[in-house]
Amino acid sequence: MSFVQIRHISSQINRKTVSIVGSGPSGFYTAYHLLKKSPIPLNVTIWEKLPVPFGLSRYGVAPDHPEVKNCEETFTTCAEEFSSPTNQKHKFSFVGGITIGKEILLKELLDNQDAVILSYGCTGDRKLNIPGELGTKGVFSSREFVNWYNGHPDFAKDKRFTDFDWSKVSKVGIIGNGNVALDITRVLISNQIDEIWENTDISSLALNLLRRAPVKDVKLIARRDFVHSKFTNKELRELWELEKYGIRGRIDPKFFQKEMFDPSKYDRAFNRRVEMCSEYLKPFNERSKKNYKKAPPPSSGYDKFWELDYLKTPLKINRDDFGAINSLSLCNNRLNEDNSLQPLKDVNNIMTYKVDLLITSLGYAGVPMPEFSKLSIGFDKDHIANKQGRVLTSSGEIFPHLYASGWIRKGSQGVIASTMQDAFEVGDRVIQDLVVSGALSLENSIDLSNIKHTTWKDWERINKKELLRGKKEHKTRSKFLTFEELWNGVEGI
């Protein structure tokens, strides 16, 4: 463990100091851009509440999508280059295991740094706000569920998951139809197909529990219609292609028929989606294009199903005598003539779906830091109030030297590539301001000598051990699942 005082000082070079709160893609891409593009010397420190870096890339990406995590290679190369003593212009430090606002106050960063960038992402959940949503066994948010199967130390051994009776889960409901909802559908409907999951970095504890679930049916429930689906074609295709394992996709004809959609009114991506669905809904031998006939279903036919369900609003989560979910009450919706964002509920037409597990995938929500109110930092619903990345006060004025990037700046939307673009744009504004800002004080220091934390070298030790554990288990990586395991992973080689 490293217990050192970080001092941004050099006898030869005056470096301006930048602190970034959060080590996920937005934080690391911001650091990368600053270190690669700044014409003036910088000392950049990333602060992370977990002992390990990479945030949503490490804990939010589907285990069977390792290519999405390629950004971690870029971050690692950057960290190694700029934390090396041989780099004379810029310096980089990683400080893990410290929560800004707790062990170190945000005000302390603001008082000791030339710029502070908040890139800590969205750590809350958007809610249904219906009876039964809270406290019902077998009801989880997508954020909780994804963090659990990805081995996040806050969730990996959470008793809500480990004590849940997965052997009773046959029917699943998922509220939402974005990419995260499709990821979760894929995990659940193919939970017993070892060739998909056994070599990934999915938590072995979670996978062993999921394997107990005899999942037969997953229903993705959306308030609006097919046109307003939030998923991408790539994610949807992956679900359709599970048919080779006997997994069949379904859409009720009242929600989808090719003739419903005039190609001249939609973009190319949507028209491809229509073609994809219309082809995959046909029997395998009746499909017209080879692209949709990659691998036939087994001769025994289909025994598991997922379904895209539309124009429904959840009204109530119903429990059994033991406090576990047993059904979901919903009503039909209809869209206004102008296809407005708010569908109209038909509360006189209520139905009930039998479900053994319910995942709410409504999006992640940003949460303000505890000091925001005291420091008069503006917060707008689920993200930090800002003007092109420059944070605003509660009264709408620019807060000096304080910035935001990523989801906490704009809300939980977009993929890692769009997060990168946002981080670069904010990084450019930070550089613009630093270049014209006043003279740097000769010594800016934050004393960490008595605070337990990890460094980049500590992460390298943890990383090496996780990869070695994974190799022994025939996986790409076997993550440490608790804070205790992560801290212990720092010791030794």
From Swiss-Prot:
Top-rank taxon: Eukaryota
InterPro entries reported in the protein's UniProt record: FAD/NAD-bd_sf, Ferredox_Rdtase, Ferredox_Rdtase_adrenod
GO terms for cellular component: mitochondrial inner membrane; mitochondrion
GO molecular function: ferredoxin-NADP+ reductase activity; oxidoreductase activity
Catalysed reaction, written as an equation: 2 reduced [adrenodoxin] + NADP(+) + H(+) = 2 oxidized [adrenodoxin] + NADPH
The keyword Metal-binding belongs to this UniProt entry's keyword annotation: no
EC number: 1.18.1.6
Keyword Transport annotated: yes
Signal sequence annotation: none
Positions of FAD binding: 26, 48, 56, 100, 407, 414-416
Gene3D superfamilies: FAD/NAD(P)-binding domain, NAD(P)-binding Rossmann-like Domain
Membrane topology classification: Peripheral membrane protein
Disulfide bonds: none
Keyword annotations: Electron transport, FAD, Flavoprotein, Membrane, Mitochondrion, Mitochondrion inner membrane, NADP, Oxidoreductase, Transit peptide, Transport
Family: Belongs to the ferredoxin--NADP reductase type 1 family.
Further facts: Present with 1600 molecules/cell in log phase SD medium.
Function text: Adrenodoxin reductase transfers electrons from NADPH to adrenodoxin, which is involved in heme A biosynthesis and in iron-sulfur cluster assembly. Involved in the electron transfer to heme A synthase COX15, a heme protein that catalyzes the conversion of heme O to heme A. Required for the de novo synthesis of Fe-S clusters on iron sulfur cluster assembly protein ISU1. Involved in electron delivery for Fe-S cluster synthesis. Essential for coenzyme Q biosynthesis. May be involved in the electron transfer required for the hydroxylation reaction performed by COQ6.
Designated name of the protein: Probable NADPH:adrenodoxin oxidoreductase, mitochondrial
